[in-house]
């Protein structure tokens, strides 16, 4: 995208808003949030992981965050690590035109805001004789992230006379110099004279004081080139996807951007955790949120994935505490996060050098798995207990999703050890994975309304229920607030789907079951039906006990329930489009209790939802577009009736362009190396620059 396009490109068709005379409008005809007159809580967010900026509809930087180090805490079941934050609030710009100062953050003029290329916010401030365009970005240069936010400012003369223009210095303090400002401010360009229709450009950098040397880098660099490079980074991350319904493309990209923006890095480039989403920045790190938000990295951002694996290798297991005992069984799935991400990373990239460089990853993953396996008692099934999922229980004596994670960890490590020629370990974990899968499919299922399906977990005395007494213990009992819909006569009904249990939804992504397997399909269909006690037909989502009318990951499970019904799936996607706020983000809790469809809220208890965004990207890629790697072979099997074009797609170890029609797949290998692609009957070796054509199967 050229700078001219940045200035003059049309307004984003979906994600935009306008403030004029105190009235908020949008050209988005679909979002439920268009009906909310108050813009409180609506933010447009900018991130490169080292820097996070949350801007309001007027363009004020509400909060600018730089990330620091980690520390252990003892507070919530799903939180035992915090990250330190350095923050500054309420930063705004002023311009001077012909001697008059204009405050851009004041609502005394018409303000338009949208997102460029589904990533960076663009503000257009309209005045009688000129307009000011501000594009905010956190620089990503040749994959190097700078610890700063940059605002590129363009002042456009819309009169027949020349204008004297300048951008005023941003105040370094409010009332006295000792006021806390955790930021360095540097400006390029000061004054200019512009003739009719000419443009003056300025740049302001808000720099982390701990990276003070980057101020000089800013002063010596071409900032418009930085903007182009940053936009190009996201263009490469997204690829050029086109579909009959452009709204789905925009929704997908914003979900990927939300996952990306959930994460924090310190100045040294180490991942130090995540937030709920891109807003707000939180000291607390919910490990489970971080895990799901990171799943797209396994496919699209290998360097970030490596750093996330290393973080979970250090912090995945809850340490021994006084409030919570800790240990592997505190949360089985969280304890396995490093092993899971390592498995998915290898599955998509085929890279073994990372594991040779960091041998502790496989050593620690194996140790955790061996400690879990050692718990098994004679006569017990090949299943293992877990207390917590995140802040809610891993329900039952044995929880289905948690044991599924153990299966994926074992299966994935077996593949890695095989390539590393550690064949005895590979064989051991393959055998364990086989036994786990057999136990999960035979013992954690029941004959449901739609056929055989998975339970949330299994009980001890009765398979489909679990006594609430198991949780009526000090501290533990606080988790019962999330279970109000499933407790009957002192028993928890395990024939249900928890809106924050996402691993069963990910079964095809994990390659545990095919998405056409009746066992998987029946489970998803049940989850999105009135037979699931947590499902709400009114809002087409899954409720969250006494806390919230809906939890957003549940909407992704509901989406997958109609994967193979073209029209029904389109209707589910339509609902996700409607639930996206005017910036394109999803909120963790979009509904209050007892709300009607469309009665959405912002910033209700939780922030934006990186968990659901990562889940959406992963399920759409693996199940809808049908892209996956199996033993280094690329498989592409889109759902029936789907047509799309995806040029310059970097997916794991592949760099390809795909054309998908109703009858044929055309795949061009753009990578430097030959690529192995399956056409269901045989494996094709596709050389660089070559295109293959695969006939789509009729089902």
Predicted regions and their residues:
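Substrate-binding groove/exosite segments of carbohydrate-active enzymes
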Residues: 232-347, 499-510, 544-551, 556-568
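Acidic/His metal-coordination segments adjacent to aromatic residues that form catalytic metal sites
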Residues: 272-274, 279, 315-329, 382-399, ...
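Terminal accessory carbohydrate-recognition/targeting modules of carbohydrate-active enzymes
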Residues: 1-243, 247, 606-611, 627-699
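The feature captures the catalytic groove of carbohydrate-active enzymes
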Residues: 193-219, 326-333, 369-431, 463-474, ...
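Membrane-water interface at loop-to-transmembrane-helix junctions
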Residues: 481, 486-499
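Active-site acid/base region of carbohydrate-active enzymes
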Residues: 242-261, 346-401, 431, 435, ...
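Non-catalytic carbohydrate-binding regions of carbohydrate-active enzymes
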Residues: 2-14, 18, 421-470, 474-477, ...
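Aromatic-rich carbohydrate-recognition surfaces in CAZymes
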Residues: 227, 283-379, 400-407, 569, ...
């Amino acid at each position: 995208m050229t700078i001219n396009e940045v200035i003059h490109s049309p307004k984003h068709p979906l994600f935009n808003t306008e403030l004029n005379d105190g009235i908020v409008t949008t050209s988005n005809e679909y979002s439920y949030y268009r009906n909310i007159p108050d813009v409180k809580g609506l933010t447009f967010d900018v991130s490169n992981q080292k820097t996070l900026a949350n801007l309001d509809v007027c363009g004020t930087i509400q909060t600018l965050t730089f990330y620091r180090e980690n520390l252990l805490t003892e507070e919530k079941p799903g939180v035992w690590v915090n990250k330190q934050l350095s923050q500054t609030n309420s930063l705004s710009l002023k311009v001077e035109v012909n001697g008059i100062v204009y405050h851009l953050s004041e609502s005394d003029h018409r303000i338009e805001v949208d997102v460029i290329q589904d990533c960076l916010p663009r503000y257009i401030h309209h005045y009688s004789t000129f307009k000011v365009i501000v594009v905010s970005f956190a620089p990503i240069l040749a994959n190097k992230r700078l610890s700063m936010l940059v605002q590129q400012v363009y002042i456009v003369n819309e009169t027949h006379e020349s204008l004297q223009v300048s951008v005023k210095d941003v105040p370094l303090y409010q009332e006295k110099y000792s006021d806390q400002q955790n930021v360095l401010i540097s400006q390029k360009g000061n004054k200019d004279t512009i003739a009719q229709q000419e443009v003056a450009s300025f740049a302001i950098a808000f720099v982390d004081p701990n990276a003070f040397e980057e101020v000089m880098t800013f002063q010596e660099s071409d900032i418009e080139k930085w903007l182009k490079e940053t936009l190009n980074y996201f263009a490469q991350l997204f690829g050029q996807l086109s579909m009959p319904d452009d709204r789905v493309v925009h929704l997908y990209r914003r979900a990927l951007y939300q996952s990306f923006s959930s994460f924090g890095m310190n100045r040294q480039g180490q991942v130090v955790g995540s937030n709920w989403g891109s807003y707000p920045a939180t000291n607390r790190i919910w490990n489970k949120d971080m895990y799901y938000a990171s799943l797209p990295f396994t496919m699209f951002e290998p360097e970030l994935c490596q750093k996330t694996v290393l973080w979970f290798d250090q912090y995945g297991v809850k340490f021994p505490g006084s409030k919570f005992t800790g240990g592997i069984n505190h949360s089985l799935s969280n304890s396995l996060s490093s092993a899971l991400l390592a498995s998915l990373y290898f599955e998509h990239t085929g890279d073994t050098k990372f594991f040779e460089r960091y041998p502790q990853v496989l050593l620690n993953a194996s140790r955790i798995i061996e400690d879990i396996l050692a718990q098994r008692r004679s006569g017990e099934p090949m299943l293992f207990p877990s207390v917590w999922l995140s802040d809610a229980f891993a329900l039952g004596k044995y929880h289905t999703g948690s044991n599924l994670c153990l299966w994926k960890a074992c299966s994935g490590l077996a593949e890695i050890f095989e390539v590393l020629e550690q064949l005895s370990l590979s064989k051991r974990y393959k055998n364990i994975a086989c036994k786990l899968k057999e136990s999960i499919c035979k013992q954690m299922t029941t004959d449901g309304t739609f056929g055989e399906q998975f339970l949330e977990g299994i009980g001890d005395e009765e398979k489909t229920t679990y006594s609430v007494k198991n949780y009526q213990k000090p501290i533990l009992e606080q988790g019962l607030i999330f279970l109000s819909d499933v407790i009957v006569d002192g028993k928890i009904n395990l024939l249900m789907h928890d809106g924050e249990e996402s691993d069963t939804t990910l079964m095809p992504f994990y390659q545990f079951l095919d998405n056409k397997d009746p066992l998987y399909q029946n489970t998803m269909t049940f989850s999105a039906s009135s037979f699931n006690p947590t499902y709400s037909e009114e809002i087409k989502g899954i409720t969250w006990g006494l806390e919230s009318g809906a939890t957003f990951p549940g909407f992704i499970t509901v989406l997958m329930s109609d994967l193979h019904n073209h029209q029904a799936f389109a209707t589910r996607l339509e609902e996700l489009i409607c639930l996206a706020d005017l910036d394109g983000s999803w909120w963790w809790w979009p509904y209050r209790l007892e709300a009607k469809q469309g009665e959405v809220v912002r910033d209700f208890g939780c922030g934006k939802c990186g968990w659901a965004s990562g889940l959406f990207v992963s399920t759409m890629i693996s199940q809808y577009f049908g892209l996956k790697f199996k033993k280094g072979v690329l498989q592409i099997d889109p759902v029936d009736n789907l047509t799309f074009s995806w040029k310059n797609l970097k997916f794991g170890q592949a760099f390809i362009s795909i054309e998908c029609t109703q009858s044929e797949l055309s795949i061009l290998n753009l990578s430097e190396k030959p690529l192995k692609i399956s056409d269901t009957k045989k494996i094709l070796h596709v050389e660089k620059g070559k295109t293959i054509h695969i006939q789509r199967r009729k089902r």
